[in-house]
Amino acid sequence: MAFLARCFGCQACRSVALLSGRYLQSRVWMGLPDSWPLLSLQQARGRARGNEYQPSNIKRKHKHGWVRRLSTPAGVQVILRRMLKGRKSLSH
């Protein structure tokens, strides 16, 4: 914009200055390419992780309990295998 001071009344120089200013403003408005990775880092930082396991005693007893183990042949095999190994707790 320093050349505007030299040719103050020239219409061509004034239009070039206005166009170049608008071009710069539009590039700043769209965002520079080197600022894009920062946006992706910010989005990934806010995600909560590690809270998938929410224990429930009822579900644990229904899936791995004594009644469920004895209700299927594979469950009986699990109980016998644990007895053979010497486990104190055979099921939940």
From Swiss-Prot:
The modification Phosphoserine is found at S71. Keywords: Mitochondrion, Phosphoprotein, Ribonucleoprotein, Ribosomal protein, Transit peptide. GO terms for molecular function: structural constituent of ribosome. This is Large ribosomal subunit protein bL34m. It comes from Mus musculus. InterPro entries: Ribosomal_bL34. GO terms for cellular component: mitochondrial inner membrane; mitochondrial large ribosomal subunit; mitochondrion. Residues 1-46 form a transit peptide. One of its GO terms (biological process) is translation. Gene3D superfamilies: 1.10.287.3980. Component of the mitochondrial ribosome large subunit (39S) which comprises a 16S rRNA and about 50 distinct proteins. Belongs to the bacterial ribosomal protein bL34 family. It is found in: Mitochondrion. PANTHER family: LARGE RIBOSOMAL SUBUNIT PROTEIN BL34M (PTHR14503:SF4), MITOCHONDRIAL RIBOSOMAL PROTEIN 34 FAMILY MEMBER (PTHR14503). It comes from the Eukaryota.
